[in-house]
Amino acid sequence: DIILITHLHSDHIVDLYQLYISGWHTGRAKPFKIVGPIGLKKFFDKTAEAYADELNLRVDWEKRPNHKGLDIEITEIDNEFIYEKMGIKIKSIEVQHQPVEPAYGYQFFVDDKKITYSGDTRYSINLEKASEDADYLIHEVFVSLNFDDKRMTQDTLVNVKEYHSTPKDVGTLAQAANVKKLILNHFVPPVFDEESLKAEISQYYDGEIIVGNDLDEFIL
């Protein structure tokens, strides 16, 4: 029913317009609903403006019946977002990804289960509190970067690490919050030694650690 955006970095929003179009192509007959930080509407409106001529040609030529699927509803979070439907509750969490701000994680409550999703963040006390006794904490992790003077400076190394969470940060937060299972995602860089990463985090967290992959499914 809704798409939740954590922050306005390109790797989190670049496919948003294609999701809008693909959902319409595959039969969505209700508005495309997006929730995220202030600035989301401006971003999406500018993207839609760039594709307006192409979309108008599609609409005129393809004659699809589901016109409602092209309606858009954008909610920009003002302090806090809360959503409830069919026994599921979602709450936003403001996290620390400066200079990108605001940035959010999300809590999901399903029956008696609690899932917390970090979004991109350095160590965040808000996130720690929101993760207390969570059944699952899904958390990003900065693994490491090797210096390459063709694509980075020393400042690059320092600054990229500084607005993400190290393995120690992730493990310490999960332990402090008494998280039952920790699922790692959003790896920087994307290629790394999984067992070494789990071993490093397990120095600080004694629960189950799962290295997440796209399309993984977990039973609550």
What is each model feature region?
Residues 1-116, 196-219:
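Binuclear metal-dependent hydrolase catalytic cores
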Residues 105, 112-116, 122-216:
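Cap/insert and terminal regions of metallo-dependent hydrolase folds
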